[in-house]
């Protein structure tokens, strides 16, 4: 499972393509991770918008206040898991990125 991704293209270009009025910090990010506000493209009935969101979801059934957001889903079981079953049909977005990777620590 991947826990990091890379943004190297200027987000400003994405803003122009999407025709969004959102202003975002336009830095390269070679270590985009779940605790950061990161750019996505979302579609609404009146058009597309660029939004900054934190990566991950907290399922509606999670009761603990310190529940860690889910950041990955397996495509093989996404339509079976309670956490994603409804969301996959109704709530989608485009994640602005150039690539993704899994962090590997060596001793």
Language model regions located:
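Short linear sequence motif anchored by a di-proline
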Residues: 1-105
């Amino acid at each position: 499972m991947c826990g990091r991704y890379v943004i190297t293209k200027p987000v400003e270009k994405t803003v122009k393509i999407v025709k969004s009025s959102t202003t975002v910090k336009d830095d390269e990010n070679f270590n985009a991770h779940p605790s950061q506000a990161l750019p996505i493209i979302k579609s609404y009935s009146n058009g597309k918008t660029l939004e900054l969101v934190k990566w991950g979801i907290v399922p509606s059934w999670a009761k603990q206040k310190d529940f860690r957001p889910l950041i990955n889903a397996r495509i093989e079981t996404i339509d079976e898991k309670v956490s994603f079953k409804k969301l996959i049909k109704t709530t989608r977005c485009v994640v602005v990125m150039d690539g993704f990777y899994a962090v590997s620590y060596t001793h």
